Each structure stands twice: as structure tokens, then as C-alpha cells.
């Protein structure tokens, strides 16, 4: 009798230990949307975006990247993914004296049979600019809802700094997910990452030609550092034109090294509007992904 009691206690203890180990192994969920390209331009450059400044979508890549916006900027991205998921992004920014303010959201809706129902990210950004130097910060809200309707939420911050030489070049540094405040259900796993980038206009931006290059290196928790190089080339005449782009390097979240190293894209220019397109053969979004977007900066 006593032996049976001891055996039952040992078995119960073992089961509790295994259950605790299983829960620890699962850990808090990592939002997939954080590794997705924030906008179509960055998608066409294999994720390089920290030094591609001047548009509303910078609220996700580099908060200080809003500084060149003189009045207003609006941006939107849409992708219908091969697994029937839908990814959308919207952002807006404007200037008040030496400050730029902006905000945006990323939303990923997965198929009905997925264990995860959706991912949502919302940011609010403030930037201070003096001369060619800008510093900015973003407050970021992230949530993941599973198929049972359980929502896990966290809050974090991004910071960034940019040094710009007129419209010729820009050197930018951004840190994503600095700190992690759990808001519900134990919070999310938000890996911190550092991004250092440089962009350079090889042609006068006021000429009819467009030729810009960028390079970016990123260091993220749990991943090897990656370096991406990108090139944009095109022509604009009387406000109308075409720009094509290509990016080469490891994509964000490519831990196994199975994603495409090269991405492609382009933009139709019509005054202050840019109609963007990007193609990624193999990415976290899926295989053969087409992304569409629009930017308007009057």
C-alpha cells in the first residue's frame, strides 16, 4: 500500500515536471508580422529600409525616417498571400515646425483553419529634427489572437537616428523592440534587433534620372547578422516616370537560410504619388508573393 502511494506521488511529480517543461518549451508566441516587410519598397529591396527615408512607412523601419517629410505623407500596402492570408499596412505622417508625427498599423489575417487567427501591430511616432540630424521614437502595440479567441498583447518601443546630407545621402541607425511590457496572457516574445543603413543618390535627385543605392546590416536576437544591398534606377520626366529596384541579401527571419536572397520591385511615379510593386520568390510571406502599395507625399 505504502509502495503504491510513493509510486503515485513519483508519477504525479514526473507528469507535473513534463507539463511544466512543455509549457516552458512553447514559450510566448512570436508575432510573425514583425518579420514582414513594412512596405512594398522595402520588400523589393530584400528588407532594406532603415536608410530609405522620407515616407510614412518609415514608422516601422526607422522612426527618424519621417524627418524629410515637409507636409504630409500617406502610405498603404496590400498582399493576398498564397496560403489565403491577407496582409495590409497603412501609415500616415505630417510635420509641425521641427517635429514630425506619424502612426501606422500592420495587420495579418490568417486562414480559418490556422492555429493563429491574426497579428496586429500599431505604432505612434514622434521625430525631432535639427538641420540634417533627426532622432525619433515609436510606441508600439503588438497583439496575437489564436483560433480560440485568446488575445496575447505586449507593448514596446523603437528608436532611431538619421544623419542626412541634403537629398544626397543618409546614414541611419534604428533599434526595434527596446523593452517588452506584457499587457495580457503573459505577453509576446519580441526579439530585439539593431539596423544600420546607408543610402546614396548617385544622380542629382532634381534631374530626370534616378539612381540610388543602399546597404543595410541587421543584428537580431536568435539570428545571424545579415547584410542587404539594394539599387533603384529609373527616369522621371515632367512628374511621370518609372523606377525599378532590386535587393540582394538574407531576408528578416531567414534562420534556416531557405528564403530567396534576391527580391525585385518597381514604382510608377505620378507627381507626388508612387504606385509600388514587389515580388519575392520565397519569403516568410510564402512562395511567389506579389505585394502592391501606394505612397502619396504632396
Can you say where each PLM-predicted feature lies in the sequence?
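Transmembrane beta-barrel architecture of outer-membrane proteins
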Residues: 40, 87, 119-121, 154-156, ...
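Transmembrane beta-strands of outer-membrane beta-barrel pores
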Residues: 49-52, 78-82, 96-98, 105-111, ...
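N-terminal, post-signal peptide beta-strand-biased segments of exported outer-membrane/organellar beta-barrel
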Residues: 22-98, 179, 271, 278, ...
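Bacterial N-terminal signal peptides that target proteins for export
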Residues: 2-14
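Transmembrane beta-barrel wall of Gram-negative outer-membrane proteins
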Residues: 86-175
Amino acid at each position: 500500500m505504502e509502495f503504491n502511494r510513493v509510486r503515485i506521488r513519483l508519477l504525479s511529480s514526473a507528469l507535473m515536471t513534463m507539463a511544466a517543461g512543455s509549457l516552458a518549451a512553447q514559450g510566448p508566441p512570436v508575432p510573425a508580422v514583425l518579420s514582414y516587410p513594412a512596405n512594398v519598397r522595402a520588400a523589393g529591396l530584400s528588407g532594406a529600409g532603415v536608410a530609405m527615408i522620407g515616407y510614412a512607412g518609415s514608422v516601422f523601419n526607422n522612426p527618424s525616417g519621417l524627418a524629410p517629410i515637409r507636409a504630409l505623407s500617406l502610405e498603404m500596402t496590400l498582399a493576398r498571400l498564397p496560403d489565403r492570408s491577407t496582409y495590409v499596412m497603412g501609415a500616415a505622417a505630417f510635420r509641425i515646425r521641427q517635429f514630425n508625427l506619424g502612426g501606422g498599423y500592420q495587420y495579418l489575417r490568417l486562414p480559418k483553419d490556422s492555429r493563429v487567427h491574426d497579428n496586429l501591430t500599431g505604432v505612434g511616432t514622434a521625430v525631432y529634427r535639427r538641420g540634417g540630424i533627426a532622432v525619433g521614437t515609436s510606441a508600439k502595440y503588438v497583439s496575437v489572437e489564436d483560433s480560440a479567441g485568446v488575445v496575447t498583447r505586449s507593448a514596446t518601443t523603437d528608436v532611431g537616428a538619421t544623419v542626412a546630407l541634403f537629398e544626397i545621402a543618409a546614414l541611419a541607425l534604428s533599434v526595434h523592440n527596446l523593452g517588452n511590457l506584457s499587457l495580457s496572457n503573459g505577453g509576446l516574445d519580441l526579439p530585439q534587433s539593431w539596423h544600420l543603413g546607408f543610402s546614396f543618390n548617385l544622380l542629382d535627385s532634381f534631374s530626370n534620372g534616378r539612381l540610388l543605392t543602399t546597404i543595410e546590416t541587421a543584428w537580431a536576437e536568435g539570428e545571424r547578422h545579415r547584410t542587404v544591398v539594394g539599387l533603384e534606377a529609373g527616369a522621371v520626366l515632367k512628374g511621370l516616370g518609372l523606377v525599378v529596384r532590386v535587393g540582394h541579401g538574407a531576408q528578416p527571419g531567414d534562420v534556416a537560410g531557405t528564403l530567396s536572397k534576391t527580391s525585385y520591385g518597381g514604382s510608377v511615379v505620378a507627381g507626388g504619388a508612387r504606385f509600388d510593386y514587389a515580388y519575392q520568390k520565397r519569403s516568410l510571406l510564402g512562395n511567389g508573393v506579389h505585394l502592391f502599395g501606394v505612397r502619396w507625399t504632396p
